[in-house]
Amino acid sequence: MKITRRTVLRLTGAAAASLALSSCSASGSAILGSNFSSWLQQTLGISSSGAASSAASSEDMAASSLAASEQPAASLAALPAYDADPLTGEAKRSNGRIVGVMVNNISNTSRQNARPQRGLSSADLLIECKVEGGITRFCAVFHDADSIPEIGPLRSGRDQFLQLLMPYQALYYHDGESAPCTKFISVYNYSGLNIGGKSYFNTPTHPHVAHRDSRGRNVAYEHTEFTSGKEIRQAAANAGIGLSHDYDTTFFRFADYRTGEENAMQGAASGRTVSITHSDHYKTSFRYDPQSRTYKMQMYSRISGKFENTVDELNAKQLSFDNLLVCFAPIERYSGDSGDVQQVSYISGGDAYYFSRGAVQHGRWEKASPEHPLLVYDKTGAQMLFNRGKTYLAIVDDDEWSNFSYQ
């Protein structure tokens, strides 16, 4: 049997995820390491020293890259200490805890329709990935609870979003969750808020932390739930979860706000229009607006059969982003799942495309474990330099690479 790189990525990714869910305990990472190493030896004939060396070098690279990005250059010694907003790279606005809210994106029929959503234009980071049945879902990420307006419709949690938030101890806010997501939360003892999983939130002592609004439309009940920063604060207080956190790192490596540094994308290919296919009926596109220096978002609507502006219902504004990051990864159905819950093999890494200022840089991304951050590297092997501002992050199936385009 011929073993290609893609086969190896899928096999190792699936094995690692399975071990993470079934074998981890209080000594989680150690168990994962020993089991994964032995599995590699048996399956691919890799020596234990080789596997250990590879794992160690990967961890060393991540550690050194993070350390380098967090340490100011000697020439910056006279400047104030670097204290950036973890999601945008701008000067820090608060010491609040990052909050990620799961938002519905279904648009199949007039009754099964969550669009237009509310509150997405206020998110500092918007993550999109398919979850099941080809449908994508959003995780709207905010630098603190106080910055969250009314947002929704809410939907259930998925581990592919949770894993991106875990390294930052973000509050993960959702209604319901998949079985793999439940396992991740249990295995890693993660503090989140599944408001659909705690019946006491509906008692007089702990009032509702979300509200319903059909918006005068004949939509299914599951597409009518909304929340807000105020309600999230109440839910966190009810559960005894703190909403303060002093971050000393950022989600991406951002250009330094203290010096006005910028990634001018010199020598990069043109990237003024971007077309992303998540599945047959869930497609996202962007067009660069040179006046605002942002990318304007559109999504394909199965109902209308055409692309439509992605608009925040609260303010009628089209969603726009300073940065786009498209990461390709092996995605497939969880083995043994009775439905179509999707598993992202983060341990495999993959191609990354960073768009900003109307241009694109091609690189690689990696994520060593659920507790390690997503790291993005350019072609030289250095961490990709992001311009400050809002970012759209797409996690896209490798199988859709041929349908991805930009110009």
Each model region followed by its residue ranges:
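Bacterial lipoprotein signal-peptidase II cleavage site
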Residues: 25-33, 40, 51
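Extracellular mucin-like PTS domains
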Residues: 48-49, 53-54, 58, 64-69
